[in-house]
UniProtKB/Swiss-Prot annotation:
Name of the protein in question: SKA complex subunit 1 homolog
GO MF annotation list: microtubule binding
Alphabetical list of InterPro entries matching this protein: SKA1, SKA1_MBD_sf
Coiled-coil features, chain-numbered ranges: 48-78
A cellular component term, taken from the record's GO annotations: spindle microtubule
Keyword set includes Coiled coil: yes
Family: Belongs to the SKA1 family.
Gene Ontology BP annotations: attachment of mitotic spindle microtubules to kinetochore; cell division; chromosome segregation; mitotic cell cycle; regulation of microtubule polymerization or depolymerization
Keywords, ordered alphabetically: Coiled coil
Length: 276
């Protein structure tokens, strides 16, 4: 609804109010003519007056609401103009962004969010003038190559077919759920060790730093280098413990190739395998 519609609606309400008041006056005259005695006419007139007052209050409320909406039009128009101006600025920034920085931006989830914030229907290409290299030159600074993290530890869950392929004495009372819960736990142990190996000294306590040094020595071994591992001393449940069931699970996982086992120093080291 624009300002013209609001003005016409206000005029219509004024006309309705005038007609309503004229009708009330006619009703008052009819009430006076109908009643022979003033004692009975006064209550009727009082009831009409109350109804009229309520209707006038409602009409005033509608009129105030229309006035508020009419005053809000300039503010809304200004807000739209500012939004369009900001969109043009963002488009100019994007057009002149260094190549390396642009790759970093579009490699993040912000790309999806920006596509939701600025749909194709806005058509920035028609609203923003083309900016050439000689109009606005930005010196591109060399960007450091992204650091390659080791990634999460492999979680190579077993299938029902693999569990059924085991001999009955090896499988025992193990279930698919128990074994896969254990796989998830040993992967979390390996993730924790990888974090300690990569964490700088200033972020670790003295006791934790000693363990981190020990893990770094193990991680530097040729048979372990670049792979996720956990130690026998890391195993502490609840899904995997060093009891009869836990040892049976470790035997099954080793048999199915989920890890390789070796001994480094006084540690029994389990090196996780990636899914083939």
């Amino acid at each position: 609804m624009d300002a013209g519609d609001a003005s016409r609606l206000g005029e219509s309400l004024d006309a309705v109010s005038a007609a309503f008041q004229s009708r009330v006056m006619e009703l008052q005259e009819l009430v006076l003519a109908r009643n022979m005695y003033p004692a009975t006419a006064i209550p009727d007139l009082a009831a009409v007056d109350v109804s009229l007052t309520a209707m006038e209050a409602q009409l005033q409320a509608v009129r105030r609401r229309l006035q508020e909406e009419r005053e809000a039009f300039p503010k809304a128009k200004k807000l739209v103009q500012q939004s369009l101006k900001q969109q043009r600025r963002l488009q100019l920034m994007l057009a002149n962004m260094p190549t390396g920085m642009r790759e970093d931006v579009f490699a993040t989830p912000l790309e999806h969010n920006s596509s939701m914030m600025f749909p194709e229907s806005l058509n920035f290409s028609s609203a923003v003038p083309e900016v050439r290299d000689h109009d606005l030159k930005i010196k591109e600074e060399p960007t450091a190559p992204p650091k390659k993290g080791r990634g999460p530890a492999p979680r190579w869950y077993i299938s029902t077919e693999e569990l059924d392929s085991l001999s009955s004495y090896m499988r025992g009372r193990l279930t698919l759920e128990k074994v896969n819960i254990a796989i998830n736990e040993v992967a979390s142990y390996a993730d924790g060790n990888a974090h300690l190996v990569a964490c700088p000294k200033k972020k670790l306590s003295e006791d934790t730093w000693e363990k981190a040094l020990e893990l770094r020595d193990i991680a530097a071994r040729e048979s372990v280098k670049g792979r996720h591992f956990f130690l026998e001393t890391d195993i502490k449940g609840p899904g995997l413990k060093l009891d009869t069931t836990g040892k049976a699970i470790l035997t099954v996982l080793r048999h199915l190739g989920r890890f390789q086992e070796t001994r480094i120093g006084h540690h029994r080291v389990f090196i996780l395998s990636k899914q083939q």
